[in-house]
Structure formats: C-alpha cells, structure tokens
Amino acid sequence: TVFSYDDVARLYEETEKLSLPLDAISEGTVYQIQSDQESLYAKFNPALTFVPVDFEDLSSQMTYNKCVTAFAQEPLDAAIQKISPELFDQYEIFKSREMLLEWSPKNVHKATGLAKLISHLGIDQSQVMACGDEANDLSMIEWAGLGVAMQNAVPEVKAVANVVTPMTNDEEAVAWAIEEYVLKEN
C-alpha cells in the first residue's frame, strides 16, 4: 500500500496550514517539498538522496511510500494537536522520534509488516517478540506475543508492553531481552 499523488496533496495542504514542512519518499528518494519551514529530515538521514522540489513539480504518476515532517519538537508537538481529526481515520500518523512525524497509508505499520513476515515463515504470532521505544513501535508491541519496551520508551509504549527492560536501547536492552526471553532455558 502506497500514497497516491492525491494523498500527498492532502497532507501537503494540511502541513502548509500548520506551518510544517513535508517530505515525500518514493523508492529511496526523498522529495523535499519547498515551504516556508525548513525540513530537518536530511539531518536524521544524511545517506538518503534528497531532491528539493516545488509541490507543483511532484509527479502525479508516482507513488510514495510515506511522508515525513521533521521539525523542532515544541512547535511540532503543538501542531500535532491541531491536525484535522479525519486525517487520523485516513492515515497512520505517529511520531518516531522527538522531531519526526511520519505519515503512512492506513494499516501500514510495523505490526502489519511482522504479520506478513511470520505468515511467510510459518511462525505463530505467540512466538514473536518485538522490542521498541517510540510511538511508531506501538502497533508491533501490542501485536507481538511478547511486547518489550525499552526503559527509555515513550509512556504509550510502556503502557502496552508485557515487559519493560531495566536499561535503555543505548545500553543493549534488546540484547538483554533476547538473552532473557529467547536464549534462556526455562
């Protein structure tokens, strides 16, 4: 599932109204849609290919994997509260970092990706452990047989997790979870 040009147009209209930047991603290329607000996305992912573009020059024939809004945390958080409610029904909208808001097609998130993977591998959902710390991990933490939140996870992730690690992801919490719940003999 991907975004059409019309989806990107709707998100661009919304982000312009909220004075936020919007980048549209298609097959590994980030189209930085020019606006009054500078996108910070290149600072998060400098290895990606960035192409500055006016909205009018985006191809209506292309499809887009997702859109992102990378902006200073405080104004981003304030703007999120003002996003049109119907957009939350039409799209997946979540923060994946303090300064990064992601926009995805409805039902495109980590849980659906894991479900497709285990179906292909013939693994039962109850055998899946998922680890995470940000709002974009919420769906897979809820979905997994064992949802593991890092100590530094956002409160929403900790609230739905089966386990909260005693350390952060920077302190090898994922390795701890694997040792504790996968490798340790019962």
Regions flagged by a language model, labelled:
Residues 8-10, 14-131, 138:
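Conserved acidic, metal-coordinating active-site core of Asp-based
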Residues 3, 71, 166:
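Catalytic cores of large soluble enzymes that bind and process phosphate-bearing ligands
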Residues 1, 46, 142:
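Short, flexible loop segments at the rims of nucleotide/cofactor-binding pockets, characterized by
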Residues 102-186:
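Mg2+-dependent phosphoryl-transfer enzymes with acidic/Ser/Thr/Gly-rich catalytic loops
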Residues 1-7:
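Glycine/small-residue-rich loop that forms an oxyanion/phosphate-binding "nest" at active or ligand-binding sites
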